[in-house]
């Protein structure tokens, strides 16, 4: 009965973790393997061979023509669910102007957090244009930023 009480108190957070919960049992039978080692692995054919498949070819739009950006997308999300549009555009290599004016501050923070993660994932950059407008660019787009005069440290993400 003492074991039950100890486990119950641990579960409810009224005591330290019950002893023995951190121990792992090895139920693995080391005599058998889960795969045949007699088979060899062959690499998949290159992309040129896969292009000759009978399936319809997918056309990829390339926003870079001659090394220049041919378009920039402006996104004005209303809810957090609209943030996926940012991810799609950045993933496709299209720079995004993210306008968060009129969005509740808590939602705006979540959208900026998501967008920063997407930009980090594609090795891009994010620049604040105004307190609620951001420029997000993929890695292949270089942004030249002119630093304004020092206004002092800004303590808020959306501060002037």
UniProtKB/Swiss-Prot annotation:
Where in or outside the cell it occurs: the entry states: Cytoplasm
Q: Where is this region: Disordered?
A: 18-72
What Gene Ontology cellular component terms go with this record?
cytoplasm
Q: Where is the sequence biased in composition, kind Low complexity?
A: 45-57
Q: Which Pfam families match?
A: SepF
Q: Which UniProt keywords apply?
A: Cell cycle, Cell division, Cytoplasm, Septation
List all Acidic residues biased stretches: 18-30
Instruction: Spell out the InterPro entries in the cross-references.
Output: Cell_div_SepF, Cell_div_SepF/SepF-rel, SepF-like_sf
Q: Name one GO biological process term.
A: FtsZ-dependent cytokinesis
Segments spanning the bilayer are: none
PANTHER family to which the protein is assigned, alphabetical: CELL DIVISION PROTEIN SEPF
Q: How does it assemble?
A: Homodimer. Interacts with FtsZ.
Family per record: Belongs to the SepF family.
Q: What does this protein do?
A: Cell division protein that is part of the divisome complex and is recruited early to the Z-ring. Probably stimulates Z-ring formation, perhaps through the cross-linking of FtsZ protofilaments. Its function overlaps with FtsA.
This protein is called Cell division protein SepF
What organism is listed for this UniProt entry?
Bifidobacterium adolescentis (strain ATCC 15703 / DSM 20083 / NCTC 11814 / E194a)
The record lists the lineage as: Bacteria, Bacillati, Actinomycetota, Actinomycetes, Bifidobacteriales
């Amino acid at each position: 009965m003492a074991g039950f009480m100890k486990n119950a108190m641990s579960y409810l957070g009224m005591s330290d973790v019950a002893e023995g919960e951190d121990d792992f049992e090895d139920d693995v039978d080391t005599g058998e393997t889960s795969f045949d080692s007699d088979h060899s692995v062959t690499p998949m054919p290159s992309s040129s061979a896969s292009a000759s498949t009978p399936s319809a070819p997918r056309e990829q739009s390339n926003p870079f023509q001659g090394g220049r950006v041919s378009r920039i997308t402006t996104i004005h999300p209303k809810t957090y669910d609209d943030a996926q549009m940012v991810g799609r555009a950045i993933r496709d290599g299209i720079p995004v102007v993210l306008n968060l004016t009129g969005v509740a501050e808590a939602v705006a923070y979540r959208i900026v957090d998501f967008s920063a993660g997407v930009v980090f994932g594609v090795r891009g950059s994010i620049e604040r244009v105004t307190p609620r407008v951001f420029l997000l660019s993929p890695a292949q787009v270089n942004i030249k930023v002119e630093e304004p005069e020092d206004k002092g440290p800004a303590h808020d993400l959306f501060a002037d």
